UniProtKB/Swiss-Prot annotation:
Keywords: Ribonucleoprotein, Ribosomal protein, RNA-binding, rRNA-binding, tRNA-binding
Database matches in InterPro entries: Ribosomal_uL5, Ribosomal_uL5_arc, Ribosomal_uL5_C, Ribosomal_uL5_CS, Ribosomal_uL5_dom_sf, Ribosomal_uL5_N
UniProt keyword tRNA-binding, yes or no: yes
Organism listed in the record: Methanocaldococcus jannaschii (strain ATCC 43067 / DSM 2661 / JAL-1 / JCM 10045 / NBRC 100440)
Signal peptide stretch: none
GO molecular function, one term: structural constituent of ribosome
GO annotation, cellular component aspect: cytosolic large ribosomal subunit
Name this protein carries in UniProt: Large ribosomal subunit protein uL5
């Protein structure tokens, strides 16, 4: 039985996107950080928060607690719309999504080198070019039991997402081809 048939038989097993976190690692504060904030707000439609340096590094001119990056957390429809555009920009760069980008619980990450690859974005010499990391967290309905305040419980192993299931969900939902490298190596060793 394929995952698609299983999801139709029991809709509580169908994965969904919990959140998408977009991270801009600018590496410096000041004017470049404010320009990055404009770009990320234009791409996501949400105001970013500033991430701060954890350590002082004099060779890079970074002091502890100095804002050096930006991040935005997207949920629901905004997350799905952004992810469609992000996959389009990712494939426009000629990159492929590999199965080793997925962890054992179905979460995955990928990077985009230039924000101008997004649909509707043009190069502006005053702003420059920014890259970003996109981290996607997947879950099933019922995962709230591990986060709620009262009667908190663990998610049983049978209800957790697997790497293969997450790959199939992304391929079916967004039409992205995932190159299988890890799965082929595991089959060869057995």
């Amino acid at each position: 039985m394929s995952f698609e048939e299983l999801w139709q038989k029991n809709p509580m097993l169908k994965p969904r996107i919990e959140k998408v976190v977009v991270n801009f690692g600018v590496g410096e504060s000041g004017d470049r950080l404010t320009k990055g904030a404009q770009v990320i707000e234009e791409l996501t439609g949400q105001k970013p928060i500033r991430t701060r340096a954890k350590q002082t590094n004099p060779s890079f001119g970074i002091r502890k607690k100095l804002p050096i990056g930006l991040k935005v957390t997207l949920r629901g429809k905004k997350a799905e719309e952004f992810l469609k555009n992000a996959f389009e920009a990712f494939q426009k760069e000629g990159k492929k999504l590999y199965d080793y980008s997925f962890d054992d619980y179905g979460n995955f990450s990928f990077g985009i080198h230039e924000h101008i690859d997004f649909p509707g974005q043009k190069y502006d010499p005053m702003i420059g070019i920014f890259g970003m990391d996109v981290c996607v967290t997947l879950e099933r309905p019922g995962f709230r039991v591990k986060r709620r305040k009262r009667c908190r419980a663990k998610i049983p192993r049978r209800h957790r997402l697997t790497r293969e299931e997450a790959i199939e969900f992304i391929e079916k939902t967004f039409g992205v081809k995932v190159e299988r490298v890890l799965l082929e190596e595991e089959e060869e060793t057995q």
